[in-house]
């Protein structure tokens, strides 16, 4: 496995530009475009130091979103509409039962996007492991949080990431599969990955796991990861090709 580069900051230092508490907005179920507009507005305000850092907590009605590296062969075969977005990555699905969090965070200088992504992953890994999936970790070369192959299932992604940083402020974020259906993934090449699977916490734990169970623990772990109280560790259990490397950006 290729050794990751060292972050710009010490592992125990905050990656945030501010020490003020993060404000959390619990939004319920929100149309994707409405949430995107809200993020853009908040990011502009945060860049001007008019508001504190935010984390938006929500779910979406069923929708496909296509990041900048989405390829024609990734697109859905079931006729559902696709929203082209300004985050990184390729195509994914959002819908009921999937916990979505969008941190609007002003990053400290010098901005280290890779470290920010690793801290998002670290928070997710901590939360998922605490909930009873101790094997959860990373696949080198691929973003997100993964569960190793077991019981006939391949290595499977349980949480996806896609971010954008503009004027030093983060947008978009993470999606954690709790008790959502996986059927909508059957009609796309999710994140451009054809040689792995997808899973939910409900499937891994053998019980229904609603999104509400994960909100407070994940918020706490994100806060700790951003602050450096939860430090990034090597949780990689496999390596695989990066499905976005060297692909052209859309538009």
UniProtKB/Swiss-Prot annotation:
InterPro entries per record? aa-tRNA-synth_II/BPL/LPL (IPR045864), BPL_LPL_catalytic (IPR004143), Octanoyltransferase (IPR000544), Octanoyltransferase_CS (IPR020605)
A GO cellular component annotation here is: cytoplasm
The transmembrane residues are: none
Q: What class of enzyme is it?
A: transferase
What GO molecular function annotation could you give as one example from this UniProt entry?
lipoyl(octanoyl) transferase activity
Where substrate is bound, by residue?
Answer: 87-94, 160-162, 173-175
Q: Where in the cell is it found?
A: Cytoplasm
Q: Pathway, per Swiss-Prot/TrEMBL?
A: Protein modification; protein lipoylation via endogenous pathway; protein N(6)-(lipoyl)lysine from octanoyl-[acyl-carrier-protein]: step 1/2
Coiled-coil boundaries: none
Q: Ranges for the BPL/LPL catalytic domain?
A: 49-230
Q: Which domain of life is it from?
A: Bacteria
**What is one GO biological process annotated to this record?**
protein modification process
Q: Which residues form the active site?
A: 191 (acyl-thioester intermediate)
The reaction(s) annotated as catalysed by this protein in its Swiss-Prot or TrEMBL entry are: octanoyl-[ACP] + L-lysyl-[protein] = N(6)-octanoyl-L-lysyl-[protein] + holo-[ACP] + H(+)
Q: What is its EC number?
A: 2.3.1.181
What residues does the record give for site: Lowers pKa of active site Cys?
Answer: 157
Keyword annotations = Acyltransferase, Cytoplasm, Transferase
**Record-annotated disulphide pairs:** none
Q: Additional comments on file? A: In the reaction, the free carboxyl group of octanoic acid is attached via an amide linkage to the epsilon-amino group of a specific lysine residue of lipoyl domains of lipoate-dependent enzymes.
Cross-referenced PANTHER family, in alphabetical order?
Answer: LIPOYLTRANSFERASE 2, MITOCHONDRIAL-RELATED, OCTANOYLTRANSFERASE
Q: What does this protein do?
A: Catalyzes the transfer of endogenously produced octanoic acid from octanoyl-acyl-carrier-protein onto the lipoyl domains of lipoate-dependent enzymes. Lipoyl-ACP can also act as a substrate although octanoyl-ACP is likely to be the physiological substrate.
Similarity-based family: Belongs to the LipB family.
- How is this protein named in the record? Octanoyltransferase
């Amino acid at each position: 496995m290729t050794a990751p580069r060292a972050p710009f900051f010490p592992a125990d230092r905050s990656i945030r530009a501010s020490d003020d508490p993060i404000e959390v907005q619990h939004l319920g179920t929100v149309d994707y475009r409405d949430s995107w507009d809200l993020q853009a507005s908040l990011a502009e305000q945060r860049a001007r130091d008019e508001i504190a850092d935010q984390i938006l907590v929500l779910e979406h009605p069923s929708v496909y979103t296509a990041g900048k590296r989405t390829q024609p062969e990734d697109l859905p075969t079931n006729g559902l509409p696709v929203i082209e977005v300004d985050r990184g990555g390729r195509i994914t699905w959002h819908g009921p039962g999937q916990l979505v969090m969008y941190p609007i965070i002003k990053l400290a200088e010098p901005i280290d996007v890779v470290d920010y992504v690793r801290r998002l992953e670290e928070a997710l890994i901590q939360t998922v492991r605490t909930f009873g999936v101790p094997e959860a970790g990373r696949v080198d070369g691929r973003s997100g949080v993964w569960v190793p192959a077991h019981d006939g299932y391949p290595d499977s992604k349980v949480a996806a990431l896609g971010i954008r940083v503009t004027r030093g402020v983060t947008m978009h974020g993470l999606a954690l599969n709790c008790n959502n259906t996986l059927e909508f993934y059957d009609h796309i090449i999710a994140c451009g990955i054809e040689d792995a699977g997808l899973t939910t916490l409900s499937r891994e734990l053998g019980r229904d796991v609603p999104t509400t169970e994960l909100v407070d623990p994940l918020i706490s772990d994100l806060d700790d990861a951003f602050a450096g109280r939860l430090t990034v560790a090597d949780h990689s259990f496999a390596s695989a090709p990066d499905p976005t490397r060297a692909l052209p950006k859309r538009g």
